[in-house]
Amino acid sequence: MKTYVSLGIGDLFFLDSILTKEEKESISEIYWACRFGYVMEKLMEGNKSYPNLKAQYTIDDEVGKKAMATLDPVAVDFWHFRPDFHPNFETGLKLFDIEDEWNNQNLQTIDAPSMFLDDTRPFQSSSFIKHSKAIDDEYILFHYPTSTRPRNDIASITMDDWDFVDELSKYHRMRVLVIADSTIDVPLSSYELLIKPDIKHVVDLVANCDYYAGCDSFCSILAAKALPKDKMFIKQSPNFTGWNNWLYRAFLPHSPEEVRQIYKQHIGR
């Protein structure tokens, strides 16, 4: 069925892991009503767990920004037209020119926030991990905070964080693959800096890493679908306000107790 979706990349990895096989197979077309739709379109291309997905549609960035400015000027740079907010949803339908599809019940929406909080939806599997390409290497994957997010919205990496990762690297004799979106100084003994690698390659890197460390991001959510708790070190966002069901479930299949051990104010044990 034609499907309307509005979420972030990390949310996609979360959503995919709780959709049933039947739900995945029901999707024939996707309308990505969000800024990074073009990234998710690429992620979904050729995904064998969605065998009936034949077409995907996105909104041009400038078009999305202009439309968002009339709804919520503060959110222009991270525009989205969620189906659970009626004015936003109406705007998204109009931009895709699919009002008739909705009115004729030929379109389904995915209310991701409600699904994320639904305890009756257990972890199923990650199709992205399942269909990733094998990498014959041993390494620690480190995701450095993006330069485009406000500093009060994403973790900062300290020398203590770097020191822990360096010691982990030396102990296991593994190099560290550092993913970043710009040139940064990396105070590690053995590393390779990957600047804006292809998103599908990022998935492969996450799926095959021996350890994951870094900021709370889409990489950390995906890593949780592949690694045991003792091989993950995620640094909290500085605007962390406390534990909640959404946060716990984002890191499924780990239990809330395990998430508390993984997700800390520092990178380390």
For the regions a language model picked out, list residue spans one by one:
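Nucleotide-sugar donor-binding patch of glycosyltransferase catalytic domains
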Residues: 221-269
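A nucleotide-sugar donor-handling region in carbohydrate enzymes
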Residues: 53-59, 83-138
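Active-site and donor-binding regions of nucleotide-sugar-utilizing enzymes
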Residues: 1-101, 201-204, 214, 219-222
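A short helix->loop->beta-strand "cap" motif at the edges of active sites that frequently abuts
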Residues: 27, 172-174, 227-231
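Catalytic donor nucleotide-activated moiety binding site of glycosyltransferases and closely related
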Residues: 141-155, 159-202, 222
